[in-house]
Curated annotation (Swiss-Prot):
Keywords: Membrane, Phosphoprotein, Sporulation. Phosphorylated during meiosis. During meiosis, exists in both unphosphorylated and phosphorylated forms with the highest degree of phosphorylation occurring in mid-meiosis. The modification Phosphoserine is found at S24, S32. The gene is SPO24. Its main location: membrane. GO terms for biological process: ascospore formation. The keyword Phosphoprotein applies. Disruption phenotype: Defective sporulation accompanied by the appearance of pseudohyphal-like projections. This is Sporulation protein 24. One of its GO terms (cellular component) is prospore membrane.
Amino acid sequence: MVAFLELTSDVSQPFVIPSLSPVSQPSSRKNSDANVDDLNLAIANAALLDASASSRSHSRKNSLSLL
């Protein structure tokens, strides 16, 4: 016996898996308890890493690169 899925235009409730849902509550999200100081520190660290990476990418004239 072959069964077919009947397609309709009826709107039903969405199927949501709570642990995987992209619209989960903020309390269940990872790092949701980070405070402003933690975020500012992360932004400052990212800026420092970016600045040091760009300064290392420019080699000096007439010098040998070890990388």
